[in-house]
């Protein structure tokens, strides 16, 4: 069985390490992988979000199973695209569809999902207008958390200590695009 692990972090190294010990694994590839995965298989010079490149590698290396670690390729629909590849023999894929991954890739979607289904979660407000957000932070309840809605590589959560600090954060996210589109809400 030929396997492809997508990602370059410690999580993907741990997955590749465990998979490499299986007797059914013939070849192990990682895209892009890291120094640790290089000793376990072959690192491919592909970014985890290079969906066309990954699809090409699946065909070129006759991949049977793809394990996707990072959230970004999941949110970009990698598993959905893999299921459409090679209709006669699509590769198996370990990872959710783009629709299912949305619960991780969109904080506003996740919080709304929990509210609709009665799942306990902290109170929240979603703003796509900077002016409305700035008006909201001027009144209690304090303290609160400012979160970028999209994927921000662990950098999208802020604990401001004052309305002024919260305003600076909101302006940086929504106007300055400090986290790109992740901070649009």
Labelled PLM ranges:
Residues 21-24, 59, 63, 84-87, ...:
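Generic secondary-structure signature for well-ordered alpha-helical cores
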Residues 1-98:
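ATP-binding N-terminal substructure of ATP-dependent carboxylate-amine bond-forming enzymes
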Residues 90-156:
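A conserved helix-loop-beta module that forms one wall/lid of the active-site cleft
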Residues 47-50, 106, 129-130, 162:
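Acidic/polar helix N-cap motif
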Residues 44-48, 84-85, 110-113, 141, ...:
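Short, hinge-like loop/turn segments at secondary-structure boundaries
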Residues 7, 127, 157-162:
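Short beta-strand-to-turn element immediately C-terminal to the catalytic PLP-Schiff-base lysine
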């Amino acid at each position: 069985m030929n396997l492809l692990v997508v990602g370059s972090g410690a999580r993907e190294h741990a997955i590749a390490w465990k998979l490499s010990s299986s007797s059914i694994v013939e070849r192990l590839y990682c895209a892009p992988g890291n120094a640790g995965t290089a000793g376990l298989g072959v690192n491919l010079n592909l970014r985890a979000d290079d969906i066309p490149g990954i699809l090409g590698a699946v065909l070129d290396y006759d991949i049977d199973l793809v394990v996707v670690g990072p959230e970004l390729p999941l949110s970009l629909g990698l598993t959905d695209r893999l299921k459409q590849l090679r209709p006669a023999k699509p590769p198996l894929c370990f990872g959710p569809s783009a629709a299912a991954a949305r619960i991780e890739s969109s904080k506003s979607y996740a919080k709304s999902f929990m509210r609709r289904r009665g799942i306990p979660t902290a109170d929240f407000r979603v703003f796509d207008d900077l002016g409305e957000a700035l008006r909201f932070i001027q009144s209690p309840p304090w303290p609160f958390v400012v979160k970028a809605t999209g994927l921000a590589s662990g950098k999208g959560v802020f604990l401001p200590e004052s309305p002024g600090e919260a305003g600076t954060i909101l302006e940086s996210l929504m106007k300055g695009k400090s986290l790109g589109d992740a901070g649009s809400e």
